[in-house]
Each structure stands twice: as C-alpha cells, then as structure tokens.
C-alpha cells in the first residue's frame, strides 16, 4: 500500500512540474519547419494556351506550388529514386515559385513529345539544403549558387552562362559545365571535385587544363577546347577521359591510365594512333571516330562493351575476340565484309561502307541495325533478315534501317518488300534515312511511306549493266515498244524512255546526280546506283 501511494505522489508531482514549465508555451505557435523556396523564370513562349513544365525532385522530397495560385501541380512516376512532377500554368505565365523540402532539382525534366518552355533564370537564394542541381539545356545567362553551400552535384551544361562563381561550394564533387560561355573557371575552392566537364567553352588563350591536376579527378570531359597536347601523368586516376574534337597531333602512351574505363579521342588530327598504347586491360568503351585510320585491331580488349570507329578509312576491323562487345558503330568506312559471328551484339551501325556481307551470330540479341548505303545482295539480305527474325532482344521497339533515299549516299542494298514485311512481322520497325538535321543527326521515316516501298524484282529476267553505272546504263530483255520510267530516291520520275523493237535500251545518265535510282518497267522494278 505504501509503494502504491508513493507512485501516486510521484505522478502528481510530475504533472505539476509539467504544468509549471509548459504552461507559458501553450497557445503559442510551434516553430515553423524549414522550407526551401525556388523561383523559376521562364523564357518567352510563342505558344498559346496553358503551358506545361516538367521537373523532377528526389524521391523523398516534398514540393508544392506557391504561385501562381491558379496553376496545377501533379506528381508523376517515380523512377531511379526520382519523383517526376508536372506543372500546368495559365497562358502568359512568366515565372512560378515552389516551396517544400528540396534536396534535388532537375529542370526541365522534359516529357517525350512535349514542347516545354526553357528556363531563363533561377532564384535559389532560399534553397540552402539543395544537394543536386541540374538545369542543363536552358537559356540561363547567370547562375548564383552562393547560398547553396551544401551543393555537391551541379549540372548546368548548354546555357549562355559567361561567369560561374563556385567559391562557396566546398563540398562540390561533380561539375558538368560544358558548352557555356566561360572564359575562365576557378576551382581552387572546390578541392573535392572528382568529375569535371568543361568541353566546348571559349576559354582564354592562357587557359591551362593542368591547373586542375591537384583535384582527385576520376572523370574528365575536355572536348572541343583546342587542346594541342595532353599529359596523362597529370591525371593518373582517371576512369573516364573524353578529349575528342581537339587539335591533338600525338596521342602518346595512355597505358599508365590503369583505371581508365571510358575513352573518347575521336576527331583529332592524330598522326600516331596506336591501339596497343591504350589501357586495354579494363577499357569498357572506346570512341575513335574521325581519325583517318585504315586498320583497327581490338583483339586484346577483352572487356570492351562499346566501340565507335565510324567516319574513318577502315578496310580492316578485328573485334572477334571482344567477347563482351554489345554496341559496334563502324559506319562511313571502306569495309567490304563484317564477320561478327563470335559476338553477342545488341546494336550494329555499319552504314555507308562497301559491305557485301554482314555475318551475325545466332546468339546475337539485336535491338538496332543500320546497314544502309552498302552492297548487300538479295541472298545476303535474306541471311541477315533470318538472323534478325530469330533474335530475341530485351527491349522494344527494334529498329532496322536497310535503306537511304539521300542522293549523296549510293544505295545498292537489295531488300524486297517481302523481306521487309517478314522482319516487320517479327516486331521490327523498318526505317529509311531521308536526310540529316542541322546537328548532323539522321532524319528517318517509316518504310511504308517511302519510295523504297516499291517492290524490286528479286529474280531479274531484265539485265542492267554496268551497276554501279556512270554516264549510261544498258538495259536488256525488256518488252519491245514499251515505256520505262526512271525514279530517283525521292520517288520522282526523272526520265522516261521508249524501248525499241529489240527490247534493249541504252539510257544516258550524265545529266543525273550520283545516288540511288529505280527503273520501272512492265517486268518489275529494278534498283541501281550512279557513281562517278
């Protein structure tokens, strides 16, 4: 009984003390939770109606639209620890503000097929807890990150930013600032930077890449800077080096870079490219495009996964012992045959060569194949299509590009519509290259909408020679006294001729540009090319 009484006394005393100390706080508002605020100014848009803006935050972050009040914020899918967010803003909106708990901000997080406005300015003064900022590909001219002292990752590529003050970011570990308007970049206050991208900036003549040699760099992107030399001993721990598009005349010996996994050295006027001086022990990807080399032997590169050796003068390419190779891009060379039967390829780009055969493994799980602008016969094309039909890739859609209608690219591949239908039935999308855009990227259209959908006659009773043709082409075994029509690759009839009583005809071609053509007669459709 005494013990019970003692506990009652203690409880009463505790309640009394709580009342004494907590009573002064009753009725007072609780301390506000820390809130981040980001103000976004949009570039002018010519579009009418409501505007849609997409961005992403970290999966655990919270965000709400502070203004304009008439806007709508919707949370989208979660992927790779990121939360997609979409905004619908009234027409004429020039800015909006977000509040919440924000550690990561990626804008614009563009949705496929959506025409979203770009960002003209970011006010980050009230977002001190921000750890990651990605604002690449916008119209930002000035970026103030002086209050974002916790920032560790900054990606601001492709903006017209002329100055970048990073002096208050001591924890910065990754900086991607390529294609800005920078004349100089001081990283003396950022000793932790391990990943650095500065390609395509108009740095002053006294720019010194080795000023960053004291940084613990693992990744370095310094492409298109006009560099005339590179001393790999200054950056011994590199795992990734992108140095393409410079003025390097000598590659030197890169074998000391024992940790190197990814190397891009293309589009340099190298005089001494030697694959034997590369650190082949661990290399996973190699980009050696546009070097003018005629031979490439990668037999010792056991772990390599991706190779881009396009736009060279290759007549010999050896990759058969690259057992981990999945992506091979060797277009715009002078190769006549590709034997890839030992590889488990997923993507092959071998367009604009002189290939008469492309041999793939039965085990290849092809997802993309571009082989236009070659000399594949009907028999070889049938073999190729059989391999594509049997492959069982992991992704869809699968894309097959066997043709081009570009006049400057001779097309001698023979792929009847029956073969196209066969590969389409197996789930492949068949494309035709029709041109290139201002950035040099290929423009394609669906096979069915192109003039290549004309059915070439696979077993020719009609003879055309020479093929490739030059100033003329001879056509034999035609029906007598019938009209022929000559089509260019765009599907336009550029010439009509009447056969004689013999069923033979000599067609003058000197007035026509080089490229791919089709001769249509009663007997069928016959492709040929003009070369000079």
Language-model segments: what does each one mean?
Residues 57-61, 99-101, 127, 148, ...:
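Short proline/glycine-enriched turn/loop motifs at strand-loop junctions of beta-rich domains
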Residues 122, 143, 164, 185, ...:
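Canonical leucine-rich repeat
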Residues 436-465:
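Residue-level detector of functionally pivotal "anchor" positions at catalytic/ligand-binding pockets or at interdomain
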């Amino acid at each position: 009984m005494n013990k019970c009484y003692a506990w009652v006394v203690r409880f009463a005393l505790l309640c009394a003390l709580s009342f004494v100390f907590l009573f002064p706080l009753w009725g007072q508002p609780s301390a506000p939770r820390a809130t981040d605020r980001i103000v976004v100014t949009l570039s002018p848009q010519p579009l009418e109606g409501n505007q849609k803006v997409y961005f992403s935050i970290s999966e655990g972050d919270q965000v709400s639209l502070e203004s304009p009040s008439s806007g709508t914020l919707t949370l989208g899918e979660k992927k790779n620890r990121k939360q997609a967010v979409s905004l619908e803003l009234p027409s004429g909106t020039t800015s909006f503000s977000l509040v919440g708990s924000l550690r990561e901000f990626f804008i614009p997080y563009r949705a496929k097929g959506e025409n979203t406005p770009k960002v003209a300015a970011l006010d980050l003064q009230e977002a001190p807890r921000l750890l990651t900022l990605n604002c690449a590909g916008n119209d930002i001219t000035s970026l103030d990150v002086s209050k974002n002292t916790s920032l560790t990752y900054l990606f601001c590529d492709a903006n017209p930013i002329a100055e970048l003050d990073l002096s208050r970011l001591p924890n910065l570990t990754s900086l991607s600032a390529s294609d800005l308007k920078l004349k100089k970049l001081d990283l003396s206050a950022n000793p932790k930077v391990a990943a650095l991208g500065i390609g395509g900036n108009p740095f002053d003549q006294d720019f010194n890449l080795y000023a960053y040699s004291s940084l613990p760099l693992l990744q370095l992107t310094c492409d298109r800077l006009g560099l005339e030399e590179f001393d790999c001993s200054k950056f011994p721990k590199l795992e990734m080096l992108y140095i393409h598009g410079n003025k390097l005349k000598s590659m030197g010996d890169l074998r000391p870079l024992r940790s190197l996994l990814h190397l891009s050295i293309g589009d340099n006027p190298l005089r001494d490219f030697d694959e034997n001086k590369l650190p082949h022990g661990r290399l996973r990807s190699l980009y050696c495009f546009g070097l003018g080399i005629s031979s490439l032997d990668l037999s010792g590169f056991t772990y390599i996964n991706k190779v881009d050796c396009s736009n060279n003068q290759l007549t010999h390419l050896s990759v058969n012992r690259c057992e981990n190779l999945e992506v091979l891009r060797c277009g715009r060379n002078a190769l006549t045959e590709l034997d890839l039967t030992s590889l488990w390829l997923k993507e092959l780009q071998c367009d604009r060569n002189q290939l008469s055969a492309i041999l793939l493994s039965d085990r290849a799980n092809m997802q993309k194949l571009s082989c236009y602008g070659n000399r594949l016969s009907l028999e070889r094309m049938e073999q190729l299509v059989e391999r594509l039909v049997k492959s069982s890739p992991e992704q869809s859609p699968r894309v097959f590009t066997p043709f081009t209608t570009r006049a400057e690219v001779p097309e001698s591949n023979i792929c009847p519509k029956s073969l196209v239908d066969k590969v389409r039935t197996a789930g492949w999308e068949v494309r035709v290259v029709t041109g290139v855009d201002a950035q040099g990227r290929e423009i394609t259209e669906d096979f069915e909408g192109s003039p290549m959908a004309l059915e070439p006659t696979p077993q020719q009773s009609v003879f055309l020679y020479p093929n490739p043709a030059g100033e003329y082409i001879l056509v034999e075994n035609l029906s007598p006294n019938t009209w022929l029509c000559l089509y260019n690759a765009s599907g336009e009839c550029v010439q009509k001729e009447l056969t004689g009583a013999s069923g033979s005809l000599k067609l003058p071609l000197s007035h026509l540009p080089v490229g791919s053509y089709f001769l249509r007669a009663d007997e069928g459709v016959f492709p040929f090319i003009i070369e000079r």
